Each structure stands twice: as C-alpha cells, then as structure tokens.
Amino acid sequence: MRERYDMADNLPNILVIMSDEHGPMFSGTYGHPIVETPSMDRLADEGTTFENGYCNSPLCTPSRLSFMTGKYVSHCQGWDNSTPLDVGRITWPWLLKTKGYDTVLNGKMHMMGPRPLNGFDMQ
C-alpha cells in the first residue's frame, strides 16, 4: 500500500469515533466534573465536535447501516440486528477510497453479509 501514501500525504486525516452506549456527557470535553478523558479532549480541541447528534435507530445494526450509507433506516431496509448491508449500497469509506484515502475500521460494526468491511481497507 505504500504507493498510495504519497498521494494521500496532502489529504487531511479523518478520525470518526463512534462509541456504543457512551453519552457525550461522560467526557471531559462536554464538561463532566469527575470523568477525565485527556486523549478525547485533545482530539476534540484539535478537531471538530458535534453538539447536536442524531441517532437514527435505537438498535445497533440499523443505526450503523444508516450511518455508513447516509440513508434513513427505512431506505436501508435494516429493521433488526441481523440485517446485512446490501452489496449495492455505497458507504462513505468507499467514497473516501475514491479520493485516495486508506480506510481502517477498529472495533465492531456488526456488518454481516458478503462485504463485511463495506469499503474499509482493513480491520
């Protein structure tokens, strides 16, 4: 993959942190009086934070399907945690790859089906 790094050197880094069952109020960035999160605080200070997030489904997989595709859950046809992402769906990692990014997934996404990485180069 080294040949791609030269092209990507001028691209800004994009880091998306999506935690499961973690409210922002439990981090120093959002003012918790006791919990200390210095690494997250530094990332927030040097990057972008979002004050008005929206969770499109109370279930893990439908919410992730929507997040990965930018579509409503009803458009992804993901109603439960066993729904695979349709092979024909374009995800934002696929789009980033077309712009020269290397994409890595760290953690779980519960994406089942024939394309479990759904655009990520590696996990």
Language-model segments: which ranges?
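Formylglycine-dependent sulfatase
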Residues: 1-123
